[in-house]
Amino acid sequence: MGETIRFGISIDDKLLESFDQLIEHKGYANRSEALRDLIRASLIDVKWENGEEEMVGTVTLVFNHHVRDLSDKLTEHQHAYHHQIISALHVHLDAHNCLEVLVVRGKAREIKKIADELIGVKGVKHGKLVMTATGHDLH
């Protein structure tokens, strides 16, 4: 971690008031912590948009396991991308529905492609990709 530097910013009073409400709602200790998180989030977004950066994340899927061949298709996808899908969690939500959470790692564009393919499999009721940085470049 580098040296901490103090700096000042000019901000509209109403915007600052809204920011302070957000800080309180999220439970930040102070404005500095909240601002650091916002900067990190922006940097991660840029890496995600670039497509070439190494990212990690999760693909969450909800599906009815009674749909013909669906479980097999999802498993085939996982095996096809075994280098990028580094872990899987399967939960039986009820007698029909399952939740699958896949931990993924790789270039952002590759991860997005994998997620789109999995979410697009016929029978998947809902799917979502959540990406973040590997932590190497975050300070």
UniProtKB/Swiss-Prot annotation:
Entry keyword Transcription: yes
Cofactor: binding comment: Binds 1 nickel ion per subunit.
Source taxon at top rank: Bacteria
Residues given in the record as Ni(2+) binding sites: H79, H90, H92, C98
GO biological process: response to nickel cation
GO molecular function: DNA binding; DNA-binding transcription factor activity; nickel cation binding
SUPFAM superfamilies: ACT-like, Ribbon-helix-helix
Keyword annotations of the record: DNA-binding, Metal-binding, Nickel, Transcription, Transcription regulation
Cofactors named for this entry: Ni(2+)
Family under the similarity heading: Belongs to the transcriptional regulatory CopG/NikR family.
Task of the protein: Transcriptional regulator.
Descriptive protein name: Putative nickel-responsive regulator
Species: Pelobacter propionicus (strain DSM 2379 / NBRC 103807 / OttBd1)
Species classification: Bacteria, Pseudomonadati, Thermodesulfobacteriota, Desulfuromonadia, Desulfuromonadales
